[in-house]
Amino acid sequence: MSNVDPSLLILLVLAGLGIISHNMTVTLAMIFLLVIKITPLNQYFPLVEKYGMTIGILILTIGVMTPIATGRISAQEVFNSFLNWKSLLAIAIGIIVSWLGARGVSLMNNQPSTVAGLLVGTVIGVALFRGVPVGPLIAAGILSLLIGKS
């Protein structure tokens, strides 16, 4: 047992949390990382680490914008969003969250010691509280405000 890589155990535990909580996102993400780790694909970890967040944000953005692309949300509805107070509030909150996310990326790059706690908290939130794994960026942004760093 002393030859077991601790990161494998962490990924297995997190995959188990995903299974127990019926959270397919966490389960699949951990299995994906386990497969990469224990196969020759592990040579691509630097690429996944470097571009994974960008690719994830790209896929999330595509998913969010698809209703506009398909016409389910019309151009008129988009324009009308500037006339409704709830939509204007949503726009303002979107701006704030984007700003927090940018601060979060900066904090995670400049203070890598914060990453582990943010990731564990996010996975627990996703696995146990049905959260969505966009949390690390926003959490890091909020943390940067609290600790005065970016």
UniProtKB/Swiss-Prot annotation:
One Gene Ontology cellular component annotation held by this UniProt entry: plasma membrane
Membrane topology of this protein: Multi-pass membrane protein
Residues that span the membrane, as ranges: 16-36, 51-71, 82-102, 123-143
Primary localization class, coarse: membrane
Compartments where located: Cell membrane
Keywords attached to this entry: Cell membrane, Membrane, Transmembrane, Transmembrane helix
A Pfam family matched in the record: DUF441
Stretch forming the signal peptide: none
Domain of life: Bacteria
Protein's UniProt keywords contain Membrane: yes
Similarity field: Belongs to the UPF0756 family.
Name of protein: UPF0756 membrane protein PMI1560
Source species of the chain: Proteus mirabilis (strain HI4320)
